[in-house]
Amino acid sequence: MAAAPPAAVSEPTAARQKLLALLGQVQTYVFQLELLRRCDPQIGLGKLAQLKLNALQVRVLRRHLRPGLEAQAAAFLTPLSVTLELLLEYAWREGERLLGHLETFATTGDVSAFFTETMGLARPCPYHQQIRLQTYGGDVRMELCFLHDVENFLKQLNYCHLITPPSGATAALERVREFMVAAVGSGLIVPPELSDPSHPCAVCFEELCVTANQGATIARRLADRICNHVTQQAQVRLDANELRRYLPHAAGLSDAARARALCVLDQALARTAAGGGARAGPPPADSSSVREEADALLEAHDVFQATTPGLYAISELRFWLASGDRARHSTMDAFADNLNALAQRELQQETAAVAVELALFGRRAEHFDRAFGGHLAALDMVDALIIGGQATSPDDQIEALIRACYDHHLTTPLLRRLVSPEQCDEEALRRVLARLGAGGATGGAEEEEPRAAAEEGGRRRGAGTPASEDGERGPEPGAQGPESWGDIATRAAADVRERRRLYADRLTKRSLASLGRCVREQRGELEKMLRVSVHGEVLPATFAAVANGFAARARFCALTAGAGTVIDNRAAPGVFDAHRFMRASLLRHQVDPALLPSITHRFFELVNGPLFDHSTHSFAQPPNTALYYSVENVGLLPHLKEELARFIMGAGGSGADWAVSEFQKFYCFDGVSGITPTQRAAWRYIRELIIATTLFASVYRCGELELRRPDCSRPTSEGLYRYPPGVYLTYNSDCPLVAIVESGPDGCIGPRSVVVYDRDVFSILYSVLQHLAPRLAGGGSDAPP
């Protein structure tokens, strides 16, 4: 039986696969550029021909793809297309700039000047971009310095979309794109100076909204949030034997050269290991000699010999010490010893690398970290930790920092005794051995001292007979005879010491728990700061969503201008009479209170921006949820949120207060300045449009008149846009209202389409009524717009 043929891959899927493959190749090239900027320029000169070929390929690829990417930017962006465009632009700029610096180095031979130019040490910080956003309420200026600045600006632009013309948004987004070319286009690795994980993103907020809050406010939870979406952590583990493992398989080397390099590497590693062992020195012999002496006494005893109290005390203390040895492998012991050990590891790695370079190439390569080694050595500890090293991973640094924190706090004797109780046992064992060595283990009162020492060690473990630190006991309950004042004072002093010890133990346990909790909280921030961060998909996805919203508005106006019949009421004669007639007929009626919830949701839908589109998902949420995400992510003040929530309910369609626009001045913001007053004016205009269309449908019995947004239509696989009949709010002050009263059979705007332009709510409703009247009078079955 013949196998079934493989299923055909759709054209969009095939195109997406090709773009992903191309994106991987460009990312590889960008990563090579970043390495060559930091490597010995002699290495780049040896590969100059291949680098020029790669630069030419990137130039051809950019020239070939740029028209298609620009066309897609005007149609519908995706995070993939945005990322590919950013990488191509960065690869084209930096590749040719690196070639120029290599050619300059071939002439001058100045290594320091080469790194100064390639690393931008003499240039100002490139991550500063001035943004100017033109709105109906005035211009807004701000500066982009961090990745979260980009995300915040895009969220603010999304919230202000209804008072921003497409031309102003396009100019601002172009400046944002320039910043993202330098920030996101530089490959996968995020420069540390760009990322600030203490600023939560929109995804952080959405995650907190769907998880249990346990009584905490969203602002409090966001303050403790460490963002892992704009940039994501990449765990890096370095193997100390990588050079030894991969050197035998290095290409382009002769067998003799590889063998010579391996021999030199083994010798270098052996010398560094021997030097490290000599510097480390033998462990202190104090505690080990005590244990050896105790073990010798215990080994000399057997069951045929009598067990003295002193020997039994030694055995009991040795038991507690053995238990402590088994418990030593705690979390702290898994950390690196200290930062000096990491520095020693870096030195060993550098020594081995230099030895191999000398054996293979006869010279020491002048990489960036070697050419500027003096400057790097002058950095303080914080900067050195952020820069990192070649032989130590960020996780090793984090563990060393935590261990140093514990070591600093555990210098307190009480905490040290709580964490290492075996120290008490060793001290007690040392005292018992000293007394036995002095010949005092034969009986009498001296026999109580070893037993008291053993009981003290057991009590420190939470076991043993409760006794005072001096081994003294109070009178037994059945004892006869009067108790002297001296005995009472002695017992009271013992009780005070015991209570003091118990209080100190409880206090140290609580302090140690607080220390552990603090370390756990701070570890998350250390991991985000020191670990290697890679770019997430939040910024490309956010940029694409916001840009698509404004591109849809411009595209809608361009498509409707090419309709078969265009009726422009903005300058037509006789429109004022239509305005007066429709206004007077609608103001005599009120909106049915039962319709207020539905028109409130319609208001939220028109006010919301293009970024948060939860109402269009497969598992759609109501429009108020998407608007909630929009206003909360920009930090809208509570009184404005309350005003926005009750904007429709406050008017209710009663009286004439909801009709705020003058003739042919709908969505006009003349005389209004400031973002908040302009936003409030736009809300009033949108409320007027919603109430007017609701009353129009109920008064003239023409069915529901759909209010739509220009970005409600997405391109089909054939690149077509379908706009159903209805009244569209374009948010453009020059032509805010467009009514599509007829469209083609496929739903696209074409020769059979009838479009009405207007700047007045009542006159455009009159035009819609004129178009519907013949069909309604003749009992036509066409659905109303």
UniProtKB/Swiss-Prot annotation:
GO terms for molecular function: ATP binding; zinc ion binding. One of its GO terms (cellular component) is host cell nucleus. Keywords: ATP-binding, Host nucleus, Late protein, Metal-binding, Nucleotide-binding, Viral genome packaging, Viral release from host cell, Zinc, Zinc-finger. Disulfide bonds: none annotated. HAMAP family: HSV_TRM1. Signal peptide: none annotated. This is Tripartite terminase subunit 1. Belongs to the herpesviridae TRM1 protein family. A zinc finger (C3H1-type) spans 201-229. Component of the molecular motor that translocates viral genomic DNA in empty capsid during DNA packaging. Forms a tripartite terminase complex together with TRM2 and TRM3 in the host cytoplasm. Once the complex reaches the host nucleus, it interacts with the capsid portal vertex. This portal forms a ring in which genomic DNA is translocated into the capsid. TRM1 carries an endonuclease activity that plays an important role for the cleavage of concatemeric viral DNA into unit length genomes. ATP binds at residues 696-703. GO terms for biological process: viral DNA genome packaging. InterPro entries: UL28/UL56. Pfam families: PRTP.
